[in-house]
From Swiss-Prot:
GO terms for cellular component: cytoplasm. It is found in: Cytoplasm. InterPro entries: Adenylosuccin_syn_GTP-bd (IPR018220), Adenylosuccinate_synth_dom1 (IPR042109), Adenylosuccinate_synth_dom2 (IPR042110), Adenylosuccinate_synth_dom3 (IPR042111), Adenylosuccinate_synthetase (IPR001114), P-loop_NTPase (IPR027417). This is Adenylosuccinate synthetase 2. The keyword Hydrolase does not apply. The gene is purA2. SUPFAM superfamilies: P-loop containing nucleoside triphosphate hydrolases (SSF52540).
Length: 424
């Protein structure tokens, strides 16, 4: 069975927690896009693990894989493996595999990313971690891959081939071109290559063999649907494709293998950085949700903008991903809010819309049309079953199901593993 999990909003929906919950039933969990610009948090008891590269299934028995559609900063990978080993969790080549064709984020990518964002008149909210420039090099066939990082001779040869052009580009951007051939940084990367040499694998082959043997494989996305490089709110998007179809393309798995596609949906909506957010709440109410939900980025620490549930954006996410079920997160954050509002459509230049306009500049001009529901005062964080939820919380969930036309199978009422239950 091949299952794909993606975020249905702008990222930060709680994918890490749900993947961690479900991974016990899977033999392999594979990350298929993005880099360390994305972050996911997994809480086990009193321990909190903040991850940027390693898939969330690392904490259970699953083998975890990083596919060739990911752009990988080996320094971050080393930091994460060290963090786990500090907590007594061994992350060796039997536990973690990285595809040979995975593109490597080089120091010059990070330098160029920062220079480009500083020069922009309109900021797009990049994390300045070199993700975009690593993807540019991948498309231009100018990347350094994992297979080259772990082979000293190949790595140095490839770097010499690329260095003159990279130095010219950095100098033209007003930066210091010496970073490209900095001996200290080169030595650091050679050591990282040596550290991870045994981790190199063929991810597509591993996954397809596992599926042939009847094993269960989960593909884990980073970020969210509306940050997709093609279908998202351009130009305020990430550099990779974040939707379910990308899992097949990037991991090398045929679409007929897909069994389930699970959406992770927050009970409200958030966005970090720039870009349109039609239901955004400014002032005291927005701050209240931000504080109650701990809405601060795992990667950047930036406060997330908060808004009411946006159905038109969800409809588009459902169309783009073909979801078979939904996991609803952070329901507890809505406690004490009266009324609860669901955006069921937009007003755009006098027209009524029930689906987002294609162009970002038009989405900026959309005003939300709300349906109001009564809220609840009960603290939900100790709730262990759907039947224990207050009536108005159940009614909110039922209404979302009616509107989305996709079943909600899991509900989360807090950050802990034990704070998620099935909707029976």
């Amino acid at each position: 069975m091949f299952t794909i999990i993606t975020g249905a909003q702008f990222g930060d929906e709680g994918k890490g927690k749900i993947v961690d919950l479900l991974a016990k039933d899977y033999d392999i969990v594979a990350r298929f896009q993005g880099g360390n610009n994305a972050g996911h948090t997994v809480r086990v008891g009193d321990e909190v693990y903040k991850l940027h590269l390693i898939p969330s299934g690392i904490l259970l028995d699953a083998r975890v894989l990083i596919g060739p559609g990911v752009v990988l900063n080996p320094e971050v990978l080393a930091e994460e493996t060290a963090m786990f080993e500090k907590h007594g969790i061994k992350v060796d080549a039997e536990k973690l595999g990285v595809d040979a064709k995975t593109s490597i984020i080089m120091p010059y990518h990070i330098e160029m990313d920062g220079l480009r964002e500083a020069a922009r008149k309109t900021k797009i909210g990049t994390t300045k971690r070199g993700i975009g420039y690593a993807y540019i090099d991948k498309v231009a066939r100018d990347e350094i891959r994992m297979a080259e990082l772990v082979d000293k001779e190949r790595f140095l040869k490839r770097l010499e081939e690329l260095a003159p052009q990279k130095e010219k580009e950095i100098e033209a951007m007003g930066g210091d071109p010496k970073i490209v051939r900095d001996p200290f940084l080169i030595q650091k990367y050679l050591e990282l290559g040596e550290q991870f040499a045994s981790y190199v694998t063929d991810v597509s082959r591993e996954i397809n063999q596992a599926l042939d043997e009847g094993k269960h494989v989960m593909a884990e996305a980073a970020q969210g649907t509306h940050l997709d490089v093609i279908h998202g709110t351009q130009k305020f998007v990430t550099s990779s494709s974040t939707i379910a179809g990308s899992a097949c393309a990037n991991l090398g798995v045929g679409p007929t293998r897909v069994g389930n596609v699970i959406a992770i949906v927050k009970a409200y909506i958030t966005r970090v950085g720039e870009g349109p957010l039609p239901t955004e709440l400014s002032g005291e109410l927005g701050e209240k949700i931000q504080k109650a939900g701990g809405e601060f980025g795992t990667t950047t620490g930036r406060g997330r903008r908060c808004g009411w549930f946006d159905l038109p954006l969800l409809k588009k996410a459902i169309a783009l991903n073909g979801y078979t079920e939904i996991s609803l997160t952070k329901l507890d954050v809505l406690t004490g809010l009266e009324p609860l509002r669901i955006c069921v459509g937009y007003k755009y230049k006098g027209e009524d819309l029930d689906y987002p306009p294609e162009l970002t500049e038009d989405l900026w001009e959309c005003s939300p049309v709300y349906e109001d529901l009564p809220g609840w005062e009960t603290d939900l964080t100790e709730v262990k079953a759907y039947s224990e939820l207050p009536e108005n919380a159940q009614n909110y969930i039922k209404r979302l199901e009616e509107l989305m036309k996709v079943p909600i199978n899991y509900i989360s009422v807090g950050p802990g593993r034990e704070q998620t239950f099935k909707k029976e």
